[in-house]
Amino acid sequence: MYAADLKRAVEYDLEQERMFDYGGLSTDEIIRHVSRFTANLWQIHAFCEGNTRTTAVFVIQYLRSMGFSVNNEIFARHSWYFRNAMVRYVYKNNEGVMPEPKYLERFFRNMLLGEQWDLRNRYLVINPPAEFAEQPRLDTPTSPMQTEQAPNKHRTSTEQAPNMFYTDDK
């Protein structure tokens, strides 16, 4: 995408958002819309690096301007989940994989409503093994709760900064 195309895409999304009326919407509808807006803005991918971080900062500022009390804590703790949830929101292919908004909506439900969805990437996998097929909500007794960390039978992350934060103060 060229700079002019990127500018037009960003301007289009921002103009659509400017024209959107949040009045009278339920909390679920607001979260649904904010999720869509966030994923669409992220999908433009205006930068070589830092698109997810930039989107997170923008969303924090935007939600604050709407009166929400938010900070970057959830983004810092679950940045990879946030990025992958946006991928799942917009991704489709010829093999029947369709966009799935629920993961990004659950991220925002945790942030805005204090819900406790388990925000681990294993639940975003397409065609996951049975034990990861249903993302648990940790604050409801009817949700499939996991009382302990699932075994590392299925790798869910790569070690990008191995032991860099370990200090041995002997």
Question: Language-model segments: which ranges?
Answer:
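FIC/Doc superfamily catalytic core
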Residues: M1-K170
